[in-house]
């Protein structure tokens, strides 16, 4: 069976990682005095992170992949608890980052932005690594064809980034 959901999850992870890397690269260039802070760019990239991971990607994982995996394997419970908690923490961290960025207009503090953004990016990269290297193999091991049909359907909805 072709598993489109896994390909989509990994593709979305690559996209999210690329945006985070772009943010960090711009912050590093600003800190080094090579570029001026581009608030439009920062805000557009933050909008992407709020739209894609927080409103599209994580809800699909929670509602479909994680839910079905919980039903099929107690082996996955601890990692799923951890990842779901990280989804909540990620939203909180992103709200804090947005506040730092909103304050940047009035009081530019590239060091505060760098510190918060670096911590956020590292936590997201670690999170995505656990999904790719722990959850997906468990899902491949335990989920049924019927589970994958439902998961694939859910992930295909946004395959062409229609909701972004």
Give the ranges of each region predicted by the language model:
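Small-residue-biased structural context
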Residues: 1-164
């Amino acid at each position: 069976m072709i598993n489109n959901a896994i390909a989509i999850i990994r593709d979305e992870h690559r996209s999210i990682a690329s945006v985070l890397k772009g943010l960090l690269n711009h912050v590093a260039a600003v800190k080094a005095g090579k570029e001026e802070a581009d608030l439009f760019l920062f805000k557009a990239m933050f909008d992407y992170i709020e739209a894609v991971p927080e409103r599209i990607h994580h809800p699909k994982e929670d509602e479909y992949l994680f839910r079905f995996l919980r039903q099929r394997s107690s082996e996955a419970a601890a990692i799923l608890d951890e990842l779901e908690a990280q989804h909540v923490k990620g939203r909180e961290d992103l709200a804090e980052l947005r506040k730092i960025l909103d304050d940047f207009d009035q009081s530019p503090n590239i060091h505060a932005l760098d510190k918060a953004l670096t911590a956020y990016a590292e936590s997201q990269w670690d999170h995505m690594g656990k999904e790719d290297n722990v959850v997906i193999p468990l899902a491949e091991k335990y989920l049924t064809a019927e589970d994958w049909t439902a998961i694939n359907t859910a992930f295909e909805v946004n395959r062409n980034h229609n909701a972004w």
